[in-house]
Amino acid sequence: MSSSPDVLVVGAGLAGLSCARQLHEKGVSIQILEASDGIGGRVRTDHLHGFLLDRGFQVLFTAYPEAQRLLNYPLLDLRSFAHGALSWFAGGMNKLVDPWRTPGSWKDALQSDFGSLTDKLRIARLRRRLRNSSTDEIFCRPDRPTKDALQSEGFSKEIIHRFFRPLLGGILLDGKLNASSRMFEFVFKMLSEGSVCVPSHGMGAIPIQLAEKLPAGSIRLNARVDALHENELTLAGGESLRARALVIAADGLSAAHLVGEVEPASRSVTCFYYSAQEPPVPLPILILNGDGAGPVNNFCVISQIAPSYAPQGKHLISVTVLGTQALTDVQLGGFIIAQMKNWFGKVASSWQLLRSYRIAHAQPQQLPGALEPPQRPIRIRPGIYVCGDHRANASINGALVSGTRAAEAVYSDLSR
């Protein structure tokens, strides 16, 4: 590896890996500097006693256009959630069936308590409209809070509260539905066009696959960048590195610090993982908190989706709480188990806590107006570029697209 590569990339998250890989494929020499002890950024998987613990509940939407272009889905061995969801309200579990992807389910879908017939017809209308819209069209539409968009579609208060609030709360980390309506429409389009999956070896398999095509020695771990000046980076230990181009692919807060921008607002989330002897729900399905009571927003038995997430004879339960609570793990865990006992009975008392993750900066906030323009500038000043989901949209697709745009800008400039 040359001591002076053409490009230094700061951050081995999805955006940085996407950028570096595409530059390498064009014959540009690169080196990635990663502050932590591993690649993936926020998309990492820990191994604990035979369990696979993603750092927060995460999924891959197979319809993501850039993921389809850059990732090899068969090699990821993707395992799919069932289409639809369960939602707890009115003292019981209620099933929302996706009749478009579940053969023979139209009767069940129309007869379920999940919204009125009018609500279901409006979901069909929304689904058709978004499937007929390109992602570029969606991100150029007038922006407003998601709750306003749902109300303007004519959805009832009941289905907004029981379905859209916890579903979008889990995806956009926004239980109040204040996030950009552009993000809501993009997410709903992706849900309508593809599956929701996890790789059999954990979400961390995604960055590993991106990194596999990079040259040996091109990723340097535990290399925190403290400052940049023109075409030079200074590491935490005082070492200086130079390159023809610098790509800042760090998280939004770190990137803002390095390039002198205002720190972007972000959303936080908490995830608790439990080990269980038996699955409380023997289905590979997402479970939503439709009545809003208690801390848990969404829940799943992740080993029902991907059995490899748990050792033989055990099951892995993932519980998502929006925000990072001031409570201790013991206190919050007590409230979680109390809520789960209400849903599933005393069996929840036997669950064993494996680990909790409190992620203060899980996603860019992206309120209405934050996605204007839909793609923020990549080229900050001559020789310095910034990429990440905070430059596009809060999704795996946004991170990958941003990395691609950075690679294209760098290659164009270096080729002049």
Positions of predicted regions on the chain:
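Mobile amphipathic helical/loop "lid" adjacent to a hydrophobic cofactor/ligand pocket
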Residues: 64-68, 72, 76-177
